[in-house]
Amino acid sequence: LKNHRHTLTLVHKGNIMKFTEGGFKKWGYALAEREYGEDLKSGRLVVNDCICDAFLQNALLKPQDYSVIATMNLNGDYVSDMLAAQVGGIGIAPGANINYHTGHAIFEATHGIAPDIAGQDKVNPSSIILSAVMMLDYMGWNEAAQLITDALERLFTQGVATADLARFMPDGKALGTKAFGDKLAESL
């Protein structure tokens, strides 16, 4: 809510997996009611749910209909890769694991390792950079986070990116990892 995200969609396969995924759906609604009851009553927060296979299609056709998505691990693996592809691939998608009870958090790239291109100056650092942006926001360092976000947006608008993204940009200028990092630092 503090980030102006007022709709939560619980993505599940509860129609088939009634106890596990159906339980997740019930838990999600119960948690929202317990933690955000007043916001639900006032309409400030809307919680709905969607069967995962329908969500996969709808998210491609009408992404603007979704703001915050909560799902279980297996569905999340499919959903996160599909949605990352919509914005350039997993090389740009940030990730975070946050325990909202303790406040402990880990921010990380959403993808795994790529040993086949290690040391070749080909890696897109945007995922880990944007994960750091999320960390800065989480810590309340919003101005620093915004400076980095603005710098990345400037580069992407100019068509400056690593090869995995530049190939999709009109007049894209593909840079290696180090050169891209240097350009980002200059753009700050």
Functional labels for PLM-detected ranges:
Residues 1-50:
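Glycine-rich phosphate/diphosphate-binding loop of Rossmann-like nucleotide-binding domains
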Residues 1-2, 14-17, 147, 153-188:
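Glycine-rich phosphate/pyrophosphate-binding loop and the adjoining helix
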Residues 14-18, 22, 45-49, 68-69, ...:
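Hydrophobic alpha-helical scaffolding
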Residues 21, 25, 125-129, 177:
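Short alpha-helical patches at coil-to-helix transitions and adjacent helical residues
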Residues 27, 31-34, 135, 151, ...:
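Generic, well-ordered alpha-helical scaffold segments in large soluble proteins
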Residues 50-57:
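Short acidic loop-to-helix transition motifs that present clustered carboxylates
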